[in-house]
Every structure is written in C-alpha cells, then in structure tokens.
Amino acid sequence: MSKTIYYACKYAPLELFAGYGATFSALDPLAESFSCAERCAHANLCGYAKAVLEQVEQSGIRALVLTNCCDAMLRVYDVLAASGKMEFLQLLPVPHQSTPATRARFARDLRRLADALQRYTGQEFDAQRAHAFFVH
C-alpha cells in the first residue's frame, strides 16, 4: 500500500507536504459509475464529490487531504472518516475572508496539518525541501 498523500483541491498546501518529505498526488476523479458513492453517501451529492469517493475506494487510497471549498467536500470527509479505512485523512478549512481572526485560525489549522504530516511521514519539516518545491 502506497504512502502517497492525495489531495482534491488546488488550495492544498503542497509546499507543506514537500517539507515533510511526503509523496503526494492530485486526485483525477473520473468515474464510470457511482456505485460505491451511492451506497455510502446521499444520492444528491454532486458528481465531483461522488467521483472523489469512487476514486478513493476503487484505487485503495488511504491518505487524503481535503479542503472545505464546498459543502460536498465536507460530506466526502464525513463519509471517509466514518468508513474507518483511511490511514491519514485531514480536512483543511480554507478561509473565505482575510481578517486577523481568520488568519490566526488558518495558522492554527496549518499547524494541526503540519503536526499530522509529521506523525504520518515520521519526518521533521525541512524548509529547503519546501522551498525547492515552491520554486520548481
């Protein structure tokens, strides 16, 4: 089983993943059917969210970072968390405003994700790895 961390949103902090030496990849959720998603989630979930659930199940993905960019991703997180199959599942709330309070909360949320990445990868954060990814 791969230790690759998958992500479903362009707002995922890839430099942070790189800083912890994580292998990561974007999901490419193109599903031929939604049989799994329709068994484990509400039928009215959008097609993209169903495709994410299908890809996770069909590909055996066990490490995923989601963001709260839309309500459907919150439901995907709920379904995957309830499944008990995920080794690493994180939800990163992305702020929709830029106020001192939202910036402070986002900093705490990034710290929580960083702590989880450190536990999952077993590595310390390396700023050079993060920077190398950022400038590539």
Describe each model-derived feature in a short phrase.
Residues 1-136:
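An N-terminal assembly and electron-transfer interface module characteristic of large anaerobic redox
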